[in-house]
């Protein structure tokens, strides 16, 4: 999931 990736990157 793309949005989750951005969330984990901070």
Swiss-Prot record:
GO terms for biological process: polysaccharide catabolic process. The keyword Protein biosynthesis does not apply. One of its GO terms (molecular function) is dextranase activity. It is an enzyme of class 3 (hydrolase). It catalyses: Endohydrolysis of (1->6)-alpha-D-glucosidic linkages in dextran. Optimum pH is 4.5. Keywords: Carbohydrate metabolism, Glycosidase, Hydrolase, Polysaccharide degradation. Its EC number is 3.2.1.11. On the 2D-gel the determined pI of this protein is: 4.5, its MW is: 158 kDa. This is Dextranase. It comes from Bacillus licheniformis.
């Amino acid at each position: 999931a793309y949005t989750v990736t951005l969330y984990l990157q901070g």
